[in-house]
């Protein structure tokens, strides 16, 4: 992204913003029309802004009346006020820069086209035809709505019960900051300083990677009530680590010998995440919301109660029928010390709650601002509405909304990945002799796994147990909303705070979650703000995913990357709007440096 435009003349001579853009590839056939439509709109906007900006120059000189240049977009009547002219220049220049970003391929795993019965596709809430099977007429009404985007078509989707789909039209919303969702896909995005693939296709149903992720989910379901600090001595955790170590497609962190250890289970692999306790310091250190004390103890759910482990209940939930079951509360508030606790937290949290709380904790423990903050060394000023506390807090909240609509586009209009509960149902059908009712088959690595056998021994069936009576939310799995919000929000916090700051006096929840005790591990002096921000992103997204059984590991990993890319895009846009001159560097999730500058 270029630096802020310093004059209207510079801005309005930027021509052909989109005409010369080179695409990085084609969308998958399934999604080509949707991607093409969104690309066409962005192209029209870019062309109009480039050509219309030149037209606008003449308008400014001759004071002609406003002119419509695209449906809903007008070149305004000129004004002599320099601030309005400057504001207009910044807005048009920013839109020009965004419209130049190429549109990458939007590549799915191919399962929707591969299986006629749609057993590998998200269909929850639609009228079902059997375990793992959707009513195909209902599915066609669903796809008609997604393909048309017509609000009336969404009202004609054939549902199986009273539960409604969770906001599919949010994915069609446009934003006024940052690049568009369609500009982030199965390619890197150098314009947003992200050089890894942003949103690769999810693992396909029959792949070893899919099977490995499902094995991990079965183990997580069996460890839901075990304190993270107890994993090191827990026999089930040891079995889980041993089995996952032997799976080449396991994507989680390993030790220096290539092994998964009990203390590495269900962790992310970004820098700093394997240092210190499982739970981020930002989730447990007491803080203040103004004058309100926050001790970070949470209401959680009673241990040992899981759901959707019989065919009748499973099928009710897939149809969107209320089973009448409800989560039972643990009467004792606890610190986040187990998978069930994280699941309960993320079941009820406000969209950006964890990251706003993290912002409060960073202030409580005295983390300095990012050294690139223009007020870091000022003798006469401090930041406030810009580069100060109100800016910090408001930007964390704002980016969450942008991130959610971005990921909703990918969920509903590209990938339609089904939920782990559906994968567990396929395992169950195959292992109970009903596999021929389905077109798809999962990999033998999950069918023959110790995890599935241990789950059957506990529950008496092969379904993947769920921490919530309703199972997953009624939106597709990939990517995950909690993950993209995590990636976006931690990027904002890295932009504003000094990520290299070492967190003093780290703590860890006790085994029962009733108290905090000092963390005395040998790596206690290596726990940094950057590492704990990376860690909280996985804590919260896995807390909403792997631990309760409603998301896959790859949902989170891709989502955090997507959120980071979007946040960098928004920060680059906002850099144009600040009066202060600055250059801010921060460390991305891959360990490399991003730079936001308007100098």
Which residues fall in each region the model found?
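N-terminal export signals
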Residues: 40-62
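Intrinsically disordered, low-complexity segments enriched in glycine/proline and serine/threonine
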Residues: 17-18, 26-29, 37, 47, ...
